[in-house]
Amino acid sequence: MSIKLEISFSKSAKLNGGLAILLKTAEADSAAGAETVDPAGVIVKAARIARYSAKSMNGLDIVVPEGAPVDRIVVIGLGKAAELTAHDWLKAGGAAASRIKNTDKAAVFIDVPGLTTSPRAAADFALGMLLRAYSFDTYKTKKGDEEEKPAKSVKVTIVTADPAGAKKAFSDSEAIAGGVNLARDLVNEPPNVLGPVEFAAKAKELEKLGVEVEILTEREMRRLGMGALLGVAQGSVRPPRLAVMQWKGGKGKDRPVAFIGKGVVFDTGGISIKPAAGMEDMKGDMGGAAAVTGLMHVLASRKAAVNAVGIIGLVENMPDGNAQRPGDIVTSMSGQTIEVINTDAEGRLVLCDALWYCNDRFKPQFMINLATLTGAIIVALGNVHAGLFSNDDQLSAQLTAAGLSSNEKLWRMPLGRDYDKLIDSKFADMKNTGGRQAGSITAAHFLKRFVQDTPWAHLDIAGTAMGSPQDEINQSWGSGFGVRLLDELVRAHYES
């Protein structure tokens, strides 16, 4: 289970056992808090013996002598002070959280000599701790020997010069951690537990935070003409849902910003069935919907001054006797017809109806959709960047900047008529795949046909939402990618 960190901020710490974590830059002669924790100079001696250099996120564990005010000391290196970024403070917090074992209290000293630590940096450090403390072991019945188990709850005191400022900044950090970890939970849940109905129920729980949530049933979607989404769902005994979440934190007359997520709770590929190897990972094919749900959690928790809409299309793609076939032609809510070439190109069929519904009903300032849409984007970008496709240069630039700020990086991909014509169909208005070439681009062009003139961006997060490389702030298979990115976008550009 995740370790619960009870984080507080103070100008000083009462030391009586437990763990002390001290930060140190490469240039500083001593670490933050050394005069309080280590009057005997053990740290300096240990660092000299170990040839410790305080490189970025490099740790040094020190067993303290009897009579010391703490049981254990850990020094975390920050690297060169001049090169520190906001993300480095997150990483430092994650590195610190990874060292919290078999203790129920920890004091963290972050005001390094010669370095001004802002309240925002202190809050980022704490956010890094919360993100790293997450784990998903709900279904493990054997969790190691008792002596190896970490404490379920750890009281963490972060010692800094401006505790009031840090506490104020941290209120947003707690909201962000809650949203990211909610998204991680949703992606990590097994598919027999989290179906479309169950996912919709999770979205409904956001009402406790003040989010207005509507759940559209299959009958309601059929009445609206969502033939593309329903075509994907017809092969499963589990009924589809469309969850519509609204956070009304802005002015009443302000048009909302809108986020749409692909929520294929399990994707076999349908009749165009996937290979068996790795199919278990397709429980994460709802990573876009998870990110949108996590984002709405953040916006509501921190009372964001914005009107926001989150819409998630929830289906299961299965190959039963009633499943959609290659060659079928379906009619989308827009009235445009689609020839189904490959039933494993199903996410775009879900999204096209959700996008049209969102645009038609809410007339948003922009629409951003997130989807684990194509394997082609992983071939192009790997697990480092998500693919960004957009019809609007300003929105694209804002997203790119938010990606750099949050370290949830995006790379803009091309669009153009030469790609768009690859999805023209002989028998319908379009087909749902253009073949192997430029697969992520033709998928984006398919979605573009359903947004009209509204500023729009498509984030293909197939390489970043699940199974991405673990790092200082994420040790989870489901990363929660997109939550911090989009919160940063809203915070920087769209709050009144």
From Swiss-Prot:
Catalyzed chemical reaction(s): Release of an N-terminal amino acid, Xaa-|-Yaa-, in which Xaa is preferably Leu, but may be other amino acids including Pro although not Arg or Lys, and Yaa may be Pro. Amino acid amides and methyl esters are also readily hydrolyzed, but rates on arylamides are exceedingly low; Release of an N-terminal amino acid, preferentially leucine, but not glutamic or aspartic acids
Database matches in CDD domains: Peptidase_M17 (cd00433)
Pfam family, one: Peptidase_M17
GO MF entry, a single one: manganese ion binding
Annotated protein name in UniProt: Probable cytosol aminopeptidase
Subcellular location: Cytoplasm
Family: Belongs to the peptidase M17 family.
Highest taxon of the lineage: Bacteria
Source taxonomy: Bacteria, Pseudomonadati, Pseudomonadota, Alphaproteobacteria, Hyphomicrobiales
NCBIfam families referenced in this protein's UniProt entry, alphabetically: PRK00913.1-2, PRK00913.1-4, PRK00913.2-2, PRK00913.2-4, PRK00913.3-5
Active site, UniProt feature: 274, 348
EC numbers for this chain: 3.4.11.1, 3.4.11.10
PROSITE patterns for this protein: CYTOSOL_AP
Job of this protein: Presumably involved in the processing and regular turnover of intracellular proteins. Catalyzes the removal of unsubstituted N-terminal amino acids from various peptides.
Species this chain originates from: Rhizobium johnstonii (strain DSM 114642 / LMG 32736 / 3841)
Listed GO biological process terms: proteolysis
Keywords attached to this entry: Aminopeptidase, Cytoplasm, Hydrolase, Manganese, Metal-binding, Protease
Positions that bind Mn(2+) 2: 262, 267, 285, 346
Gene Ontology CC: cytoplasm
Cofactor binding: number and manner: Binds 2 manganese ions per subunit.
Cofactor(s) required, per the database record: Mn(2+)
Recorded name of the encoding gene: pepA
KW Protease (keyword) present: yes
InterPro entries assigned to the protein according to its UniProt record, in alphabetical order: Leucine_aapep/pepB (IPR011356), Macro_dom-like (IPR043472), Peptidase_M17_C (IPR000819), Peptidase_M17_leu_NH2_pept (IPR023042), Peptidase_M17_N (IPR008283)
Binding site for Mn(2+) 1: 267, 344, 346
